[in-house]
């Protein structure tokens, strides 16, 4: 039998499966699990879900702190889960929050930076004394819902301007991934 493919998902609440209903629960059928179920028809999969609600690409939140800064924790997470065959990064949504005041290029560059960290961390199949690195892919987060522009929404101020910026993310990220060879 062939070895299982070890796939690590590095994401935020969108990958964690957060239900935006105020209860803090998660979807039973999250996309990482559905992906692994689909891929298991082709090969054996060990899914590693490293998904944390409120995680940013490379920003420490002024309220939540540095534990949610994806850049600060990525290398240790990769090394702790080795061997890893493939890393899927889906971050950037929380960088759209108004208090971070980021433009789309800052967010895209931060996402590409996470891919570069992954490509330089020896967490692949070769073991502790190998330079093998996992493959990496970036999944662009979905556009923010128009509810972010509804002043009656209790979190509208937190997400002010996020909808418009999120519409630019896919195209800008695709161009950056092409330039970076991702």
Where do the protein language model's features map onto the residues?
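Catalytic metal-binding/acid-base residues of hydrolase active sites
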Residues: 14-15, 53, 94, 142
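A short acidic, helix-capping loop that chelates divalent metal ions and anchors anionic groups
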Residues: 16-19, 56-60, 95-99, 147
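General N-terminal targeting signals
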Residues: 26, 33, 62-65, 101, ...
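Serine-esterase "nucleophile elbow" of acetyl-processing enzymes
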Residues: 1-52, 60-61, 76-81, 87, ...
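Alpha-helical cap/lid subdomain in secreted, periplasmic
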Residues: 2-3, 43, 68-182
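Charged, often glycine-rich, active-site loop that binds/positions anionic groups
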Residues: 55-74
